[in-house]
Curated annotation (Swiss-Prot):
Keywords: Amino-acid transport, Cell membrane, Ion transport, Membrane, Sodium, Sodium transport, Symport, Transmembrane, Transmembrane helix, Transport. GO terms for biological process: proline transport. GO terms for molecular function: L-proline transmembrane transporter activity; proline:sodium symporter activity; sodium ion binding. InterPro entries: Na/Glc_symporter_sf, Na/Pro_symporter, Na/solute_symporter, Na/solute_symporter_CS, Sodium:Solute_Symporter. The gene is putP. It comes from the Bacteria. It comes from Staphylococcus haemolyticus (strain JCSC1435). This is Sodium/proline symporter. It is a multi-pass membrane protein. GO terms for cellular component: plasma membrane. Signal peptide: none annotated.
Length: 512
């Protein structure tokens, strides 16, 4: 999660050339949105999932861009700058989590969502997988998505508004509205196809930025000797283990557990044209992620030497990338690099808007209007999907209008909330035949509650014992797994169709 608040130092200047680059970037996004709109046929599955026709390259980079958000460009460099190389453990945990997600979840989820009634949302898949005729699990999981993603989306709008405030000295609300209008436009009209293509485009920009800035900074300093100097400035800067503990490392690693339950990421697997394309997507996606994260660490480490060398007073470490990009490069290039920050922020906003819209349309409106109506009134449901994008965005903007630190801190824990409530359920749904509806609901609710309780009442006790300060996804995930397993063994199995479906899924996944 990216929170920008500090103004930039006086050494950082922006001019008309920077504005031109930002304007070009916005125009390209709108053109892609228009392309997505022209390609649309009025089919709900196409609007929400691209008609399951997305290729491996767009799948890989759009998944990465929507996942990393402004955290990779702003948050991680700031963390490395503040704490040194020990911050790298979270990047290792995330990379391993993403790799396992591609390997274990992606193939089966792509096939199973189609086998199980051609589900286009995660709650719809849970409902079909567990034969939930009362739609209880669909409603509960849909509510979790709508509530938490609305808050998640608002944090993205706050980041966009504060970027314009910090980098350009513009009014926060002007920046907020500008970012919102562009994102809403291409998401509203272009749907999933436009969101995926823009995320691909934005993923390319982010990667270029994360390669350029640390390399140029290192060349301006002392080449490879920069890292020796960083270590001399403070020994813990280049030490993987100093400044952290075993439990701290485990907590950072545990971020990887969240991948299996993030709706805006795993929906990319559901939309790919064929599960046979997933190995190619995995290779590209993990390569993109590895290079990008290493670049972010490089920005943080070189920044430790760069900031004092240039006599810069930096109040907020999260502005490190902005400062370095504007001092090191020509305004045109600096504008491109600022566009990379916007790309990171907007790619996540658009993905979350669309997932929330999908849930409102597929998991709630469809229940009200009836399953049969979808077949004969596709355009009505596409219109509802578009209006849902607008409604969610307006609510998120309203919350973001007066940023509240308490809300932003809550949003920062949403990854753990989704990870603890959805990750075990996704894995059990794909691999365990004995999973029951009661087990799924109990485990999902238990995981979410443990995360909330841990954040509200247990984490404040960290000063008493370090174990209370562990990342909340760890106890949430463990409790969710135990509850799901035990309750499923004690309740009625959904039926023989589950075994048939899982065997069919396994057979299709094995096809080369």
């Amino acid at each position: 999660m990216l929170i920008l608040g500090a103004s930039l130092p006086s050494q950082v200047n922006t001019n008309w050339q920077t504005y031109i680059m930002i304007a070009i970037y916005f125009i390209i996004l709108l053109i892609i949105g228009y392309y997505g709109y022209k390609q649309a046929t009025g089919n709900l599955s196409e609007y929400m999932l691209g008609g399951r026709s997305i290729g491996p390259y767009i799948t890989a980079l759009s998944a990465g861009a929507s996942d990393m958000s402004g955290w990779m460009i702003m948050g991680l460099p700031g963390s490395v700058y503040s704490t040194g190389l020990s911050a790298i453990w979270i990047t290792i945990g995330l990379t391993l989590g993403a790799y396992v997600n591609y390997l274990v979840v992606a193939p089966r989820l792509r096939v199973y969502t189609e086998v199980a009634g051609d589900a286009i949302t995660l709650p719809d898949f849970f409902k079909n997988r567990l034969n939930d005729k009362e739609n209880i699990i669909k409603i509960i999981s849909g509510l979790i998505i709508v509530v938490f993603f609305t808050l998640y989306t608002h944090s993205g709008f706050v980041s966009g508004g504060k970027l314009f405030e910090s980098a350009f000295g513009l009014n926060y609300h002007f920046g907020l509205i500008l970012v919102a209008v562009i994102v809403i436009a291409y998401t509203f009209f272009g749907g999933y196809l436009a969101v995926s293509i823009t995320d691909f485009f934005q993923g390319v920009i982010m990667l270029i930025a994360m390669v350029m800035v640390p390399i140029v900074a290192m060349l301006q300093l002392n080449g490879w000797d920069t890292f020796s100097r960083v270590a001399e400035m403070k020994p813990t800067n280049m030490d993987l283990f100093r400044g952290t503990t075993f439990l701290g490392i485990v907590s950072l690693f545990a971020w990887g557990l969240g991948y299996f339950g993030q709706p805006h990421i795993i929906v990319r697997f559901m939309s790919i044209k064929s599960q046979k394309m997933l190995p190619k997507a995995r290779r590209l996606g993990i390569s993109w992620m590895t290079v990008g994260l290493l670049g972010a660490v490089g920005v943080g480490l070189t920044g430790i030497a760069f900031i004092p060398d240039n006599h810069i007073k930096m109040d907020d470490p999260e502005t490190l990338f902005i400062i370095m990009s504007q001092i090191l490069f020509h305004p045109l290039v600096g504008g491109f690099l600022l566009a990379a920050i916007l790309a990171a922020i907007m790619s996540t906003i658009s993905s979350q808007l669309l997932v929330t819209s999908s849930s409102l349309t597929e998991d709630f409106y469809k229940l009200i209007r009836g399953e049969e109506r979808v077949k004969t009134h596709q355009k009505e449901f596409v219109l509802v999907g578009r209006l849902s994008v607008l409604v969610v965005a307006i609510v998120a903007i309203a919350i973001a209008w007066s940023p509240n630190d308490t809300i932003l801190n809550l949003v920062g824990n949403a990854w753990a909330g989704f990870g603890a409530s959805f990750s075990p359920l996704v894995l059990f749904s794909l691999y365990w035949k004995k999973l029951t509806r009661a087990g799924a609901i109990s485990g999902m609710v238990a995981g979410a509650l443990v995360v909330i309780i841990w954040i509200a009442w247990i984490k404040p006790l960290a000063s008493i014992n370090e174990i209370f300060g562990m990342y909340e996804i760890i106890p949430g995930f463990i409790i969710s797994v135990i509850v799901t397993y035990v309750v499923s063994l004690l309740t009625q199995h959904p039926g023989d169709f589950v075994e048939r479906d899982i065997e069919k899924v396994k057979s299709i996944v094995r096809e080369k």
